[in-house]
Amino acid sequence: VAVVDDDNIPYKNWGKKLLINNKIKTNFYKTSSLAFDPISATNHKNLWHRGFPIQILDKRNNVKKKIKTIKPDIQADFWNGDPDIDAICRMEHHPICKFKDKYFPLASNKVSPFNSQNTFISKKVLPHYFLFPHIGRMDDIWASFYVLSKGFKVVYNKASVFQKRNVHDLTKDMLKEFIGYENNLNLIKDLKKNIKNINSYIPEKSRLAFLRYQTHFK
């Protein structure tokens, strides 16, 4: 299943030669930090992915790289143009990016944010992948933390779209991201302890919606 935003313009390679469910060699980044920032492993190291815990931004480059073979369940393709960064990062940099192919595919030993903008998800992940409503701009980010904490693996691949971002009010975006600024780090910690701890972070109506969604896979 592919999830794509309407402001992404696909390249000719979009959706071709997918990596999920195949054994592939990756640029694998090992970190002792609680989370990994995939953008930090590219030629745009000054930026960070939306959802990466801002409390550990100064540690995002503390990684060791090696070549490792993995079998990913999720493939998060990158995006040239306007990247998926948080409002703070966008206010500071206002970047237009061209990510170099040589950095991909890449993966890590730790939880890392991926979005619903240009992502391919295998069948076995679907019952667990849910864009939690009522949590602002963290719906897809917390979905990524949840499935990765359950043990599914993500690989980040080279850009397959150009994002021409729709008009946004960055102050409003930032307000919708505050739930993440405040909770992302602790959520990652708590999901590591017990996957059911997601229920301590999402509203009751989100929890019930997730339960209803999962009934479609029984």
Residue ranges, per PLM feature:
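Short catalytic/ligand-binding loop motif for oxyanion handling, primarily in non-cytosolic enzymes
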Residues: I9-N13, Q163-N166
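Catalytic activation segment of kinase domains across protein kinase-like and atypical kinase folds
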Residues: G15-K30, V167-N183
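Active-site donor/metal-binding and catalytic loop motifs
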Residues: V125-Y129, P133, R137, K153-E177
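Short beta-strand-to-loop acidic/aromatic patch adjacent to the donor-nucleotide binding site
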Residues: V1-Y11
